[in-house]
Structure formats: C-alpha cells, structure tokens
Swiss-Prot record:
Pfam families xrefs: HD_4, RelA_SpoT
Gene symbol of the encoding locus: spoT
GO biological process entries: guanosine tetraphosphate biosynthetic process
Pathway assigned to this chain's UniProt record: Purine metabolism; ppGpp biosynthesis; ppGpp from GDP: step 1/1
EC number: 3.1.7.2
Function: In eubacteria ppGpp (guanosine 3'-diphosphate 5'-diphosphate) is a mediator of the stringent response that coordinates a variety of cellular activities in response to changes in nutritional abundance. This enzyme catalyzes the degradation of ppGpp into GDP. It may also be capable of catalyzing the synthesis of ppGpp.
The reaction(s) this protein catalyses: guanosine 3',5'-bis(diphosphate) + H2O = GDP + diphosphate + H(+)
The HD domain, residue ranges: 49-154
Taxonomic lineage of the native organism: Bacteria, Bacillati, Mycoplasmatota, Mycoplasmoidales, Mycoplasmoidaceae
Keyword Hydrolase set for record: yes
Name of the featured protein: Probable guanosine-3',5'-bis(diphosphate) 3'-pyrophosphohydrolase
C-alpha cells in the first residue's frame, strides 16, 4: 500500500490538474485543517488516522466530484472523532460543507447503532438505517461520499476483530454495493462486493478466483486472437476507438456459478471488451461490423443507448461466440463510459466560472432534482419500496422479529430468508392472527406474519411460483430435485394420500394417461399445475384420478370448464363460455394493446388460444381455423397492470439527433424500448425506424406519438 506521503502527493497533483486556483485553495484549506485536527490519532493498523479521509477524498477526486464534496470527504470524520462541531466547520468553511459532513456522520452513527442491537443477527436490516438517517432533503453526493468512505474502510478491514469484519462486510455487500450499482457506479460496486465476499466467505472467494484464473490461462490465445481480429476490422473501416478489456468480478461470478451449476463456461459475460468511440452513429456502425463478422448469441443483445437504465447507464451489449468462449462486447461513447464508471457522480462537473456554480446533469439527474425525499430516493435506489413487518415462527414461541423488507417480497420469500432450515416443513401461515388460504401472497406494511412448521417435509413445486426471489426459487428447485432423486418426493404421492383418506386408490399410470388424453393434456405435471390453481367443491380433481371409478368421464366437462375459467381469470381477456382451453398465448407477431381500434382475436388450436390482432398477416388465408373475438378485461387490467408489446414504424426527415430525441421521448413517457432497427438515408435526409416497445395501452401510445411531434420532428407512424 502507498504511504501517506505518496497519497498526499497524488492527491495534490490531481486537484491541481482539475480545479481552478480558488477551488484548489478551498480544498487545501480543508486538507490542512483535517490533517491538524486528526494529528494525534492513529488507526488500528498504526497508520496516521488522516490517511483514511485522505484516501476517501482522493476517490472523490477520481470520481469527478465537485470541490464541496471533496472538502466534506476530507472532513467527514471530524464531528465524530474530534471536538469540532458542525457550527465550527460552517464558520471556517461553509454551511454547505458542514451539512454534508453532518449528513455522513448521521449515516455512520445509525449504522453503528444498528450493529449494536441485542438481536443483531435477526434485526440488522441494512436498508432501514438509510431510511432513518436520510430523512430530509438529501442529495446523491451524500451517498457518493459515503461510498468512498466505505470503500476505504472495507479495503483496510483486516485489523478489526473477525466478527466485526463480518458484520461490516455483510452491511457493505447488502447495502453499499447495491447503492453503488443503482446509481451506476459499477466499478465501485464490484470492488465493494469482492472485498466483502472475501471477508464473508474466503473459501468460495478463493475457489471462484481460481476458476476465473484457469479460464484466463486456458483461453488466453483465443482471447488475444479475437482482439486482434476486432482491431483489424475497425482499422479497415477507419473508426476511431479505444479498446478496454475486463474480467467479471469475483462475487458476481460466484453468483452466476450458483445458477449455472458451477459451470463457468456457461457465463456469457465472464470476458468483456469495451469499445469506446466518438458518436452514437459509430456505436451502431461498430455493432453492424461485429454482427457481420462474428457468430452472435442474440439472446444477450441489449440496446441501452436507445433505452437507458434508470441510473442513466447507456451502452450496447452484444455477445460473440468463439470456440469454447463467449465474449461480451460493450459499445459506447466517451460520455457514456464516464457514466458507466462513475454513474451519477460523473454529473458533478464543475464549470470554470467566476461564480463557481455546480452543474448537475440537466434533466438527466432526476435522482437529485426530482427525488429529494428519502422515501422516494430509497425507492429509486432499491427499485422498490421499503416496508416494516413483524414475523414469528411456531418453533420460536414468544419471539417476534421486526424486520424491514422490499415491498415486492412474498410470504414464502420471507419464510425462506428467515427460516431456511425449517422452510420445507412449512404447513400454515397466519397474517394478523388469521390463517390464509394461499401462500401466493405479497407482504404489506406493518403485517404480523406467523409461520407454522410441522415435523415432516411438506415442500411443493407450486411454492416456486409463489416466490419472487430468484436465488430462493433456485434453491427450492434443487431441494425438490434432490428429494425426487432419492424417491422421497412425488406430487402424485400427495394426491394418493388424499385419495386414501377417502378410502380410494390411485389409478395406474396407463389409466391416468388415458383420462388425461380426453382433456387434451399430455403430462401429469400439466394436470397437477392446473388443479393447483383451481377451486373444486366436490373433489372432482381427485375422483378423476381414482382407481375403479367408472364415472370419471362424467367429470371431464366440469374439469374442462373449471380449467378454462382459471386460464381466462389469470389472463387479460373476458371469459368466452363454451370453449375449453389450457393456455392463452399472446403471440409476438403483431401489435396487441388494450383500447386499440382493431379487434383482438384468438385462434383455437389444440386447446391453446393464440391471440392476434384482426389484421395480423398470420390470420390471412387461414379461414379454416377457429377464430374467436376477444375482449380486454378492464378489471384485470386495473388489478394487475402491465405493459404490452407493440411494433411501431416511424419514418420522416432525418437529422443528427432525431432518433435520440424519439427514443428519449418514449422513455420519458414511461414507454419501454425493447429493440430498435434504424435505417438512415443521409442523401435524402430520411429515416425509417422500426421500434419494439412496451406500453400500457393504446392511449399511452398515442400520447407518446403526440409528444414526439413537440420535438420539431417531421414524421409519420403506424403500428405493425
């Protein structure tokens, strides 16, 4: 590690390159005051304490933060660790710097308080303290400053007791790494996650690092050859660019390995190349050359230029398939690259003006300009709301845990997270003292949730559908697979037991399949999936499986209509009486959105209802098929709002910023762009744009098109 003298030289040299004389004078003032106030303090490593705020401030300089935030970085431990007060800092520097230092101190103190809770293992929910500490109009730079502080602390954590290391590492991984990702600071997120992972699980850290290194050695020649090919193609087309290589982070790779059964070759973005070029047009030119010259895995293609992420990240991602190796290519401009590395921090560009005004990133920096309140801020950061619930379990009488969770959690997510060892034995859940009928329930604020566990394994495959957490779902799948392999789990056995309680036996597999054929159902698993979500009053679903039941065929009609009713109920269409369907498929061939003028229709084929627009080309010359008019279910659209795919063609007069304006207007209007195919004729100044986008309904689509007309763009449009 560098000495404090080396870091001081580096820091002073970098601020000299970036700032005006007046700004340098302010930063130097903070530098020397912080050094003086921390003069007699030491870290556990024996180093001068000042090395920590100095490294924190150096990170802020490298992340392009403004002088106010850099000064606060130098002073961020002053209130906590010296006798200086907020008033003193405000008097010597400014009120703005003093408030920043106070805000960061608040977060630090709340974090420490959470760590010292008596039941910290149960109660340490790391999102909650931010919700408490940032309780009034705060800005993104507070969190950026805190990220710089935490990055240095986690990088030098080895001098703390092991248990304290683990608590801080857990906090860093679950909160700070996530915040860094949400505001677009991906390199910082990777560093925080990897350093935390090393503390929390050194064995898996080393194992994952070893696998990555083996891949690097094994594919070294293939990797180098590909880069040379790429450089040659770009040189032949006279494209200016910078090429950067990266290997996926250790923790991120570990998480992917858990999904891909420890097979590292299945990770498509382990190796990546960044191509940084001058303009958006060059980005798409490079994309075309790559797709023309290499084999592409299309399922990983993402156009974040046309449809930026909420944290402003923009780039085109495409994956090249080489011999035994996948390489992700990221194509972006220099400005996009700055955002990808520093996220919203990249927008604290300090203008060289006499008055020294900060220049936040115009309308783009909506997290600062629009989301001032901490509740909204956290909702943006975590992509969901944070709610408080109370949980208890039958095996822990008189123990109630108060925890904070994302609002998109379901009951089984909570059960698995808090009681993983007992999860498979879950038999009953009560909410506020009342037993619920279905485990497929989301959590709500202030709920009291009581979990009841039995002695025997009660795990069911349908529970997977009742969970939102993909990691937990994957673990349940693996548990079911193990049980099935050992012969200790079978859903048929569950229904056989229910029949036994009625003094009936299960029919043979051959007989059951014969009966399923009458329902046009091929697999027993499909039948079980259907009856799981169907309410029967007279046990028709069980009697249908019973041995020596001559009346089973009389049950087919009520079963068919019951199944059809459930399928329609779970769709966005009104029920059509008198038909039997097992599935509704909204086909991707044409635009079908609520409220559109054209009739939506369904083609019934082998009990599957395929949904098309009346004018769809796939319906032409198919009069022999059974075509059924469909009607949107207004109530379902209100209860379960979602976006629907629409294909739009836009053509008109082209200019350099036309396509970008169109895409930005759609995004700002809450449309989601999935794919964009532009054709530009510069000689005629014309463009033709095919866009696949998702909207709520036809009215939203019309509104988006109207908004585009306000951007001084001459165009016409139609849906396909």
């Amino acid at each position: 590690m560098a000495t404090i003298q080396e870091i001081e030289c580096d820091f002073l040299a970098k601020i000299a390159q970036k700032f005006t004389n007046a700004e340098i004078e302010l930063i130097n003032k903070a530098f020397y005051h912080a050094k003086t106030w921390h003069e007699n303090q030491k870290r556990l490593s024996g180093e001068p304490f000042f090395i920590h705020p100095l490294r924190t401030a150096l990170s802020l300089v490298e992340w392009n933060m403004d002088p106010i935030t850099i000064c606060a970085g130098l002073l961020h431990d002053i209130i906590e660790d010296t006798d200086q007060t907020e008033a003193n800092i405000a008097m010597i520097f400014s009120k703005e710097i003093a408030e920043l230092v106070t805000k960061v101190t608040k977060i630090t103190n709340e974090s420490k308080k959470q760590r010292h809770l008596k039941n910290k293992k149960e109660n340490l929910n790391l999102k909650s303290f931010v919700n408490i500490a940032i309780n009034s109009q705060q800005e993104i730079n507070v969190m950026v400053l805190k990220l710089a502080d935490r990055l240095d602390n986690i990088a030098s954590i080895e001098f703390l007791p092991i248990e304290k290391q683990k608590v801080i590492a857990k906090e860093t991984l679950e909160l700070y790494a996530k915040i860094a990702g949400r505001i677009g600071m991906y390199p910082v997120k990777t560093k925080l996650a990897d350093l935390s992972f090393k503390v929390l699980d050194l064995k898996n850290y080393d194992n994952t690092l070893s696998k990555i290194n083996k891949q690097k050695v094994f594919y070294d020649n293939e990797w180098d050859n590909f880069k040379q090919q790429l450089k040659k193609i770009l040189a032949q087309n006279q494209i200016e660019y910078q090429l950067e290589s990266r290997i996926k982070g250790i923790y991120s790779t570990y998480k992917k390995l858990t999904v891909h059964e420890q097979n590292i070759s299945k990770i498509h973005d382990l190796f990546a190349i960044r191509l940084i070029t001058k303009s958006e047009l060059d980005c798409y030119h490079i994309l075309g050359l790559i797709h023309l010259n290499f084999l592409i895995d299309s399922k990983y293609f993402k156009d974040y230029i046309a449809s930026p992420k909420q944290n402003l990240y923009q780039s085109i991602h495409t994956t090249v398939r080489l011999k035994g190796l996948n390489v992700e290519i990221q194509i972006r401009t220099q400005q996009m690259d700055n955002v990808s590395k520093f996220g919203l921090a990249s927008h604290w560009i300090y203008k060289e003006q006499k008055e020294g005004l900060l220049a936040p990133a115009l309308q783009l920096n909506y997290l600062v300009t629009k989301q001032k309140h901490s509740h909204d801020f956290l909702k943006r950061i975590f992509g969901t709301d944070i709610i408080k619930i109370n949980v208890s379990a039958s095996h822990e009488p008189n123990v109630i845990k108060q925890i904070n969770v994302d609002s998109n959690n379901k009951l089984l997510d909570i059960a698995f997270e808090n009681y993983p060892k007992q999860f498979a034995k879950l038999t009953k859940i009560e909410i506020d003292g009342v037993e619920i009928n279905s485990f497929d329930t989301s959590v709500e604020n202030e709920m009291l949730i009581e979990f009841y566990f039995g002695k025997n394994n009660n795990l069911k495959s349908k529970w997977i559908r009742y969970m939102n957490n993909p990691i937990y779902r994957e673990k349940v799948k693996k548990s079911l697979a193990k049980l099935a392999k050992s012969g200790r789990y079978s859903e048929l056995a569950f229904y056989e037991k229910e029949l036994g309680e009625k003094q009936l036996k299960l029919a043979s597999e051959t007989e059951i399949q014969k009966r399923l054929n009458t329902l046009r159902i091929k697999k027993m698993s499909d039948y079980l999936a259907l009856i799981e979500c169907t309410n029967f009053t007279n046990d028709e679903h069980l009697l249908f499986l019973a041995k020596n039941n001559d009346k089973w065929n009389k049950l087919t009609k009520p079963l068919k209509f019951a199944f059809s009713k459930v399928v329609f109920h779970n769709s966005y269409f009104e029920q059509i009486e008198g038909i039997f369907i097992t599935k509704i498929v909204i086909e991707p061939c044409c635009s079908k959105i609520p409220d559109m003028p054209e009739q939506v229709t369904g083609i019934l084929t082998k009990n599957i209802l395929s949904v098309h627009r009346y004018g769809c080309k796939n319906l032409q010359n198919k009069k022999q098929l059974k075509i059924i008019p469909l009607y949107w279910n207004i109530q379902q659209l209100k209860l379960k709002p979602r976006k629907f795919r629409s294909y739009i063609n836009i053509n008109g007069v082209w200019s350099e910023k036309t396509i970008n304006k169109i895409c930005q207007t759609i995004i700002n209007g809450d449309g989601y762009i999935e794919k964009i195919i532009p054709k530009i004729n510069k000689q005629k100044d014309e463009f033709d744009l095919n866009i696949t986008l998702f909207v709520n309904n036809y009215q939203q689509l019309l509104t988006l098109m109207d908004q585009i007309t306000t951007k001084n763009i001459s165009f016409s449009w139609k849906y396909l």
